[in-house]
């Protein structure tokens, strides 16, 4: 009988060592090495005698295996193994197929360490599991110690609350995926491209005036990055070439808006009149939108000229030169946003804007108390020809002070039309009552216990809650807590 080319594989020897390395005897050699700064990721190095394509399957606990396929035929492959469970003997199956259709399959065990003790217990309420948008929820999570010290814990969880990826390296505010499937992360005044193994691929931007809060990637391959205008504070945007990292131009918002307009909500930093905290691109008309927290304003700006297209926000204290740009509210119900974060242009309809409305005080003259206030997501429809704005959707008001979030927050459109809303900085005193961020009598940040809820809802009016992620410290007598700066829904393995 004619032997096929895989018959000499038997007997096979599989070796498992502490560093999760496995060798299978020739003509196929497979080694799996855990990543250094992404401990739930690994690299499978495969050498075969004949050209093969490769499928890697990571067994899930809930009939939800992860799979990636490399269709190119080669004798050597380096395949990312993503989505391993912590503290688990993970089953990973590798399927090799030759050009003439013969296959070879081998399952191996990859052991991982438990999560660091600082990680929270993540609770999941799955209200409508069939409606959950696919992918992992990437959380820009962080832990507050009793003394206020902060530790970033960026991670990704599945729809059962299991951590399936986390990163231990240096990171600032920014963690955004780009079309290549890699991430852009902030390291000081630098934006670095990083893969899901935690490898730094390239420096994509270096901004001498600083980087903070957010960035967006344009259709023509550039980064728009929140920075500071020269000798100022968090009131600038820079445009950077995505390949060369060259700074192409800057936008000084002291020359675009009115730095003398009174801030609301206020801040402890005297120079912080605007506090840019979110940016998105509107590629259909070569513009971008930014969120200025301390002006409670979202502004659309022409990329070429830096001219204002419109201003979304309350009409109080604007000088005459800006009145022509103020959008007029139409229809009921309608509420202005206050202290907002994370504006997002709808991916199919540039007239629609979704943002997170923190709701700080909601007035210049008659502030709403935290226990009577609310935070949430709100969607507006903007008619630029008429310079009008209509509120078309909202979620969060029904929870009032229970999820009041005076700082940070996020709101995203999902691919299945759902929305992902991040009540990322729910602040309470040790009695459990909601509180504001600052104590202006003492000119200090309030002592507070911080928690986060990330909620997926439908786009209906009223919205139906699909899933809720609850991240809280369990000790009511401690100031230890957790925040989520932003949350995004991405697949671990991105199909390009």
Task: Annotate each predicted stretch with a short phrase.
Residues 1-6:
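Positively charged n-region of N-terminal signal peptides that target proteins for export
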Residues 28-54, 58, 77-78, 89-496:
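Histidine-/acidic-rich catalytic cores in large beta-rich domains
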Residues 62-64:
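Short, solvent-exposed loop/linker segments at beta-strand-coil boundaries, enriched for Pro/Gly
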Residues 18-30:
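Membrane-interface motif at the C-terminal end of an N-terminal transmembrane signal
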Residues 68-74:
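Short beta-strand segments within Ig-like beta-sandwich modules, predominantly Fibronectin type-III
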Residues 81-86:
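Short, flexible loop/turn segments at beta-strand junctions in immunoglobulin-like
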Residues 8-21:
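Hydrophobic membrane-insertion alpha-helices, especially the h-region
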């Amino acid at each position: 009988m004619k032997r096929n080319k895989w018959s000499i594989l038997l007997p096979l020897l599989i070796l498992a060592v502490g560093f999760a390395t496995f060798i299978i005897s020739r003509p196929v050699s497979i080694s799996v090495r855990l990543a250094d700064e992404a401990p739930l990721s690994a690299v499978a190095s495969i050498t075969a005698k004949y050209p093969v394509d490769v499928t890697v399957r990571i067994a899930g606990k809930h009939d939800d295996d992860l799979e990636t396929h490399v269709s190119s035929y080669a004798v050597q492959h380096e395949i990312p193994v993503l989505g391993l469970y912590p503290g688990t003997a993970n089953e990973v199956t590798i399927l090799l197929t030759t050009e003439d259709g013969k296959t070879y399959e081998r399952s191996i065990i990859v052991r991982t360490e438990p999560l660091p003790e600082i990680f929270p217990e993540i609770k999941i309420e799955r209200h409508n599991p069939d409606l959950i948008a696919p992918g992992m929820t990437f959380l820009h999570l962080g832990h507050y110690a009793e003394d206020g010290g902060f530790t970033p814990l960026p991670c990704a969880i599945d729809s059962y609350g299991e951590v399936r990826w986390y990163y231990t390296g240096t990171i600032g505010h920014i963690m955004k995926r780009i079309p290549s499937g890699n991430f852009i992360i902030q390291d000081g005044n630098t934006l670095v491209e990083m893969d899901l193994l935690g490898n730094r691929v390239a420096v994509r931007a270096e901004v001498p005036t600083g980087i903070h809060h957010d960035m967006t990637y344009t259709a023509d391959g550039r980064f728009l990055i929140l920075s500071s205008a020269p000798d100022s504070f968090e009131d600038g945007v820079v445009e950077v070439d995505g390949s060369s990292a060259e700074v192409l131009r800057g936008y000084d918002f002291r020359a675009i808006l009115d730095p003398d307009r009174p801030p609301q909500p206020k801040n402890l930093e005297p120079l912080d009149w605007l506090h840019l905290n979110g940016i998105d691109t509107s590629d259909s008309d070569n513009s971008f939108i930014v969120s200025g927290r301390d002006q409670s304003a979202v502004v659309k700006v022409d990329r070429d000229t830096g001219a204002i297209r419109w201003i979304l926000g309350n009409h109080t204290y604007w000088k005459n030169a800006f009145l022509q740009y103020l959008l007029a509210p139409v229809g009921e119900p309608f509420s202005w946003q206050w202290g907002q974060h994370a504006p997002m242009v709808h991916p199919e309809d540039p007239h629609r804007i979704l943002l997170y409305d923190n709701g700080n005080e909601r007035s210049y003259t008659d502030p709403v108390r935290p226990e009577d206030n609310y935070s949430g997501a709100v969607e507006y429809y903007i008619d630029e020809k008429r310079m009008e704005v209509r509120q078309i959707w909202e979620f969060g008001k029904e929870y009032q002070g229970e999820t009041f979030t005076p700082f940070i927050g996020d709101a995203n459109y999902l691919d299945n039309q759902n929305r992902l809303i991040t009540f990322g900085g729910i602040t309470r005193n040790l009695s459990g009552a909601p509180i504001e961020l600052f104590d202006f009598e003492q000119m200090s940040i309030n002592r507070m216990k911080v928690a986060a809820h990330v909620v997926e809802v439908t786009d209906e009016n009223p919205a139906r809650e699909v899933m809720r992620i609850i991240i809280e410290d369990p000790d009511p007598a401690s100031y230890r807590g957790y925040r989520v700066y932003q949350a995004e829904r991405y697949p671990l393995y991105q199909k390009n």
